[in-house]
């Protein structure tokens, strides 16, 4: 829809949660002229009734945090962005049934692993419930992030000039110590003795969304998988490590190398690797490269690194500033996808269903000004911030229930 000047009317957005990721997205959303924040839902009682800007440490934005789904819906958003740690169907279902689209960064890419590993109390699958809510409301549901999410899109696109593919690898190789989410790292076993028999299952439980990453790639490659296999290596701390916000005793889990392997006839054909380091002082340890790596074996072969660098002049004197870069690259794929999701047909969609413009950023207003009508995708808008590793977007550690 266009306004009288020919510019596309901003999409009305309501946000859920202002944890690490949600806080950064409130800051970024105000620089997206095609988006307008109209509501904020918070879980923490001490945030209710406060201005969203005050909550995240910026000037007031004129939107007050509320506590109920009814208030969220009453704001009449076109789309809700959900930045909690884990899916919340108590919010998803009524929002979708009300005809409001929803984009989430919480533990969802294709939904395969939620169906397999997270039974709903109703006895039905989360996918079934979400799909029915979309049908009733004529709404669209989409899950994304940096990894899983954009990292797999980059790998898929790199295969466009390759024939006779034999193997595809997408790897995240990052230091995760800047992501201060004690709850998340407790849940995945960091700090527990590396020989604790619970650790492998904990790591798998909270990273199983990366099976979705493998299945998304398989869908795009039109490759039918027999199964997705989980494998791991664990790094034990060689000394007591004090990160200030997290303690890692000697002999505890301080790093890991996880693999999700898409198997065909007992051969790994599509692989998702995670090299996560909380400290370099582990045995074994890995060559953490601080980037995302694509490797494709075929004709020709492809090797590519996606290296995220901070904006020039960024002040990294505080850990929070450094961590904000990771939050930015985790959340911006969600914000930049909103117009494509709003334009998409009703139902559950994946990145395979959206047009190329769903993965495009926006130019700064200082570059394009405020005039013009833009093209079919709307005006050229602003994107603020670069850099970071994306961190633990897959485990949900970039958000919280706040």
Name every feature range the model reports, one short phrase each.
Residues 107-138:
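Rossmann-fold NAD(P)-binding glycine/threonine-rich loop
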Residues 101-103:
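A short hydrophobic/small-residue beta-strand
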Residues 244-375, 397-402:
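C-terminal active-site/capping subdomain that shapes the small-molecule cofactor and substrate pocket
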Residues 1-98, 222, 370-373, 386-389:
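N-terminal glycine-/serine-/threonine-rich beta1-alpha1-beta2 phosphate-ribose binding loop
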Residues 43-45, 106-110, 114, 146-147, ...:
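Short, ordered loop/turn segments at secondary-structure junctions
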